Amino acid sequence: KKELPGAVAVLKRSFLSDAANQAELLLAATAESSDCALSVVEQPPLDGTKIALWAYLQTDVQTRVLPNGLYEVKHGVYRQLWMGGSFNRAANSEYQMRLLLNDYAMQLMEEGCTLADNCLRTWIFVQNVDCNYAGVVKARNEMFVTQNLTENTHYIASTGIGGGHADPKALVMLDAFAVAGLKPGQIKYLYARTHLNPTYEYGVSFERGTAG
């Protein structure tokens, strides 16, 4: 508090070395008192510690939990909408990813937003990524087409990486960030066509970065 006066957390992501044995205790200690989006993923910290915390803080904002589970962060004319740690237990990674994106799109609609116009960033954590990533890609590609997210419009900046959940049946986890109040054309998408080809050319659908 002394180093960052007035700052509040809007997202906390914990990286665990052994989610099956650590996640329940961690969530019990933090969930009830948390006023921000929480994400817990099994990715052993590189420095050898058992648990590491990544926190994103902001100042001069008002925060609250919305009825649909999203976390709202208001500043000026903008409303940031954060989601952390979403998962389900559908039969495989494709079905899980499809359900996660469909549910998230519905949450955004309740706030007058859409995936195409307002979602700026997703983080997708995939258990046993070598085996399950193909299902994630298929579900995302097919769902994005229904949301006017195509090679002719734009995609969403995203990280898709290996990461585990305390529940072995949870093959995919989703964190996401959207902003309500954006004007058409306000967001730009980062390209480096002289060095990197568009992602759709190798069968995936994400942007490498955004700028406002």
Regions found by a protein language model. Give the residues of each.
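N-terminal presequence-like segments and the immediate start of the first folded domain
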Residues: 1-212
